[in-house]
Amino acid sequence: MTTSYLIAVDGSEPSARAVEQAITDAASRKLSPHLYLVNVQPALPPNVTRFIDAETVDDFQRETGDQALASAKDKLMASGLVFSSHILVGEAAPTLVEFAEQNNCSQIIMGAHGFGSVVGLFMGSVTVKVVHLSPLPVLLVK
């Protein structure tokens, strides 16, 4: 059975460190996991999509996702690890957890964005929600 990890990527410095941690972890354990780089774009509310055609919305979400994934893809190509990148649309936390489960990932790796637990709860932190929703281990990288 091949080990696979989902790495949540939003283009931030903490998510870049999550990618670096996955590379380091694979090298130190002498693993060749399949890495799923996943960026989740928010779905636009219906009152916005009434005025913008679906193709424009799709293009915007794809371009934004590609920008967020670019650096992570470069790092993984240089590492020689097997990976695939995915841009999904929806609420970030449940979308990440669902993707990880559907693809039999052994863990989710994501950056911790440095909010305190109380602030994170009030802000609806994606990290807090993923930890709460996921039946899989979640590795948070500072």
Where are these regions (language model features)?
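Structural beta-alpha unit
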Residues: 74-108
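Phosphate- and divalent-cation-binding pockets in alpha/beta enzyme and binding domains
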Residues: 17, 95, 117
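A short acidic, glycine-rich active-site loop
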Residues: 54-67
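Short beta->alpha linker loops
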Residues: 52, 87-91, 113
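Gly/Ser-rich helix-loop-strand patches that form or flank binding pockets
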Residues: 98-142
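General small-molecule cofactor/ligand-binding pocket signal
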Residues: 36-38, 84-88, 139
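Small/aliphatic-rich secondary-structure junction motif
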Residues: 1-51
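Small-residue (primarily alanine) positions within well-ordered alpha-helices
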Residues: 15-18, 22, 72, 100, ...
